[in-house]
Amino acid sequence: RDRVMDFAKLAEADSMLNTPNCFGIYVAGLTFKWIKAQGGVAALEARNIEKAKLLYDYLDESKLFTGTAQKRDRSRMNVTFVTGDAELDAKFVKEAAAQGLVNLKGHRIVGGMRASIYNAMPVEGVQKLVDFMKQFETEN
């Protein structure tokens, strides 16, 4: 058994083999408190399902934007999509940024767009993105 993981021996010796990552522990504590304040893990899961559904439902009906992941492989956190035209993708990213919708540019090799809708992203943020996508589609 690895000495670092033998907590009984460490406790008996009233010592540690290394100094714990204090800042990491502090940040983890803040994160756990935030999760609790949001209603817990189950509430975050429900919200993440709602956000992903909102965006994927729009992508599934859009005539301009197409999701790049197969339905069975879709991520709740990173939603990737394209217009099918690299110049139009670039225009979308630029105009979205002007509306405060930032960091939507996709991977430098794959291209397209990627909306990262992690836990801290509110449903309202995803709705703002979908509303902008609808407007962009109408205008293009």
Residue ranges of predicted features:
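A short linear hydrophobic-aromatic micro-motif
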Residues: 64-68, 100-106
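Hydrophobic alpha-helical scaffolding
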Residues: 18-21, 82, 119
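PLP-dependent enzyme catalytic core of the Aspartate aminotransferase-like
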Residues: 98, 110-140
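Conserved PLP-binding catalytic core of the aspartate aminotransferase-like
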Residues: 65-96
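Short, well-ordered beta-strand elements within core beta-sheets of diverse protein domains
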Residues: 28, 35-36, 80-82, 117
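Active-site C-terminal subdomain of aminotransferase-like
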Residues: 1-56, 70, 139-140
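Short amphipathic alpha-helical segments
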Residues: 12, 75-79, 111-113
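Generic non-transmembrane alpha-helical segments
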Residues: 34, 58-62, 91-100, 132-139
